[in-house]
Structure formats: structure tokens, C-alpha cells
Amino acid sequence: MAQDDQEINYFVRVHNTDLDGTKPVLISLTGIKGVGRHTAKFIAETAGVEKNVLMGKLDEASVDRIREVVSNYADRIPVWMSNRPKDVYTGVKRHLLGADVTMTVDDDINLLKKIRAYRGIRHETGQKVRGQRTKSTGRTGLIVGVKRKKA
């Protein structure tokens, strides 16, 4: 599992992401986009790795088990745990990790713009999307002072 006499690996490569080897496994795994604390705990427990050990002190076999669990994560979890419970195009459950998260969000926003949905129009015009008030907050641009009439 963890070797105390071995030097620490400062960067551990998992799912095309460099993870910090000086942090515990639970915290280090959250460096992957799409992996939070709950997901990291599930990955560590499924891989059989102690979650409080430094990531850089794990031996190669443990890191390989973590890589395997991360790559097959969507197959091991219930629907409510995935970050994409029903894909728009295929209708199947997926859990997106890494660059797939940002690409999919961008694709979803572009789809909303294309079909001229209300949310898509708000995205296009740069306005707030989720129903916030816009009269006094979220102002951008030049600051214009108030001019008073001469008495």
C-alpha cells in the first residue's frame, strides 16, 4: 500500500491530470475535474486504498487500481451519483471527467442557443440565466455619475 522509506512522487498522473502527491488521496483525487469529495471517497474505497495516505507515497499497484476505478467509474455507481444521469443525445447514464465536463457544458449551451430556448437567448446576450434580478446588480461597463439640476 504505502511505503514510508520510498521517496514521494510529487505528481501522480491519473486520467490525463497531474495530481498533487503531497496531499492525501481523498484531497488529491478532487484535482480531477468532475471528481468531488464524495466521488473521491468512493474511488479510494473501491480501489482498496487508504484515503488519508499521501498520494505520492502510494506504490504503483495502488495507483493502477485507482486509475482502473476512475476509468470505469460510471459503471460502478447508481444513477443519482453521476453528474450526467441522462445524456441528451443517447439517453444513457454517464459520468464525465476531465475535459469532457467543459466540452459537454459548452455543447449544451450551444444547443440551447441553437434551438432559441429562453436560457440560450440569455446566454447569447450575456445576461443572467437563472432568474436573478438585473436592475441593480450585475452591472458592468462605465460608471456614470448622477447629475443634479441647478437650483
Swiss-Prot record:
<dbReference type="GO" id="GO:0006412">
    <property type="term" value="P:translation"/>
</dbReference>
<keyword id="KW-0689">Ribosomal protein</keyword>
<keyword id="KW-0687">Ribonucleoprotein</keyword>
<dbReference type="GO" id="GO:0015935">
    <property type="term" value="C:small ribosomal subunit"/>
</dbReference>
<dbReference type="InterPro" id="IPR027437">
    <property type="entry name" value="Rbsml_uS13_C"/>
</dbReference>
<dbReference type="InterPro" id="IPR010979">
    <property type="entry name" value="Ribosomal_uS13-like_H2TH"/>
</dbReference>
<dbReference type="InterPro" id="IPR018269">
    <property type="entry name" value="Ribosomal_uS13_CS"/>
</dbReference>
<comment type="subunit">
    <text>Part of the 30S ribosomal subunit. Forms a loose heterodimer with protein S19. Forms two bridges to the 50S subunit in the 70S ribosome.</text>
</comment>
<comment type="function">
    <text>Located at the top of the head of the 30S subunit, it contacts several helices of the 16S rRNA. In the 70S ribosome it contacts the 23S rRNA (bridge B1a) and protein L5 of the 50S subunit (bridge B1b), connecting the 2 subunits; these bridges are implicated in subunit movement.</text>
</comment>
<dbReference type="GO" id="GO:0005829">
    <property type="term" value="C:cytosol"/>
</dbReference>
<dbReference type="InterPro" id="IPR019977">
    <property type="entry name" value="Ribosomal_uS13_archaeal"/>
</dbReference>
<dbReference type="GO" id="GO:0003735">
    <property type="term" value="F:structural constituent of ribosome"/>
</dbReference>
<dbReference type="Pfam" id="PF00416">
    <property type="entry name" value="Ribosomal_S13"/>
</dbReference>
<protein>
    <recommendedName>
        <fullName>Small ribosomal subunit protein uS13</fullName>
    </recommendedName>
</protein>
<dbReference type="InterPro" id="IPR001892">
    <property type="entry name" value="Ribosomal_uS13"/>
</dbReference>
<keyword id="KW-0694">RNA-binding</keyword>
<keyword id="KW-0699">rRNA-binding</keyword>
<dbReference type="GO" id="GO:0019843">
    <property type="term" value="F:rRNA binding"/>
</dbReference>
<comment type="similarity">
    <text>Belongs to the universal ribosomal protein uS13 family.</text>
</comment>
